[in-house]
Amino acid sequence: MTNFRDARAEDVASIVRLYAEDELGATREVVADSPDEDYMRAFRQIDNNPSHRLVVAEDRGEVVATLQLSFLPHLVLHGGERAQIEAVRVRADRRGSGLGEALFAWAINEARGRGCRLVQLTTNATRPDARRFYERVGFQASHIGMKLTLDAP
């Protein structure tokens, strides 16, 4: 049985492995049995901030999917909070099983329960399968996302 829960420190290595499963993630993540301090520092920052949740789907003791759910206050939408879904990954052998749909239903329900008026996400232009999935679960392509990569300090 799969359950959704907030990630724990001991999940970080499994989460990074999920990030590295696709071509893009494989070029920017460092997979190791013990995650380095940069990953652990980021995990602690997320874990200690009530506006961010790093969530995993766990099945038989294994992390099989993850996403980050962040809550953003805004003046738009009459001061309504919105939820941002990021860093979505489902383990390759679990794709097409309904797990992604269940994870999104859970996340949207969490956002609704918090009073969010909108759930948003972005997806990399190199991930057409992800875009089709997001459209299938009800998201609409409505904006063009842009990013600026900064050099490390």
Question: Where are the regions that the model predicts?
Answer:
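Conserved GNAT-fold acetyl-CoA-binding loop/helix
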Residues: 20-42
